[in-house]
Amino acid sequence: MRKNRAEKRDVLADPIYNSKLVTRAINKIMLDGKRGTAQTIIYDAFDIIKEKTGEEPIEIFNKAIENIKPHLELKVRRIGGANYQVPVEVSDERQVTLALRWLINYARLRNEKVMTVKLANEIIDASNNMGGSVKKREDTHKMAEANKAFAHYRW
């Protein structure tokens, strides 16, 4: 076990939108260390969003993340030979992490041909409270509500 917790590294704001959230999205979408490709995907998706909606893409992206953020999640706790799914509140940092993860995973699962279009459409859907990533948040909240009886097992 390590002696003390590793300190969080602060990400730099991206050069175009000056947003740390966009940098985190780029890092999340990046595969095999190909940052250039990841940046191209994000920025092209933002161009598509601007084209389709006529609004600022960064505002729509922030709104989408806000709509995806979960407030509760389930953690498995083993008590007396039984596993309980205990609902716990989610920290702000983890809310954003989960929102980005779900947004990108559900964008990858979409049926469009290119990742830029998939991502753009998922962001637009999420900003309108639709799409797979928002459904994932709703399902998580429903499960937490169903397991509310085990909330006293929190740690």
UniProtKB/Swiss-Prot annotation:
One of its GO terms (biological process) is translation. Signal peptide: none annotated. It comes from the Bacteria. One of its GO terms (molecular function) is structural constituent of ribosome. Keywords: Ribonucleoprotein, Ribosomal protein, RNA-binding, rRNA-binding, tRNA-binding. It holds the Pfam family Ribosomal_S7. PANTHER family: RIBOSOMAL PROTEIN S7. Part of the 30S ribosomal subunit. Contacts proteins S9 and S11. One of the primary rRNA binding proteins, it binds directly to 16S rRNA where it nucleates assembly of the head domain of the 30S subunit. Is located at the subunit interface close to the decoding center, probably blocks exit of the E-site tRNA. HAMAP family: Ribosomal_uS7_B. Belongs to the universal ribosomal protein uS7 family. This is Small ribosomal subunit protein uS7. It comes from Mesoplasma florum (strain ATCC 33453 / NBRC 100688 / NCTC 11704 / L1). The gene is rpsG.
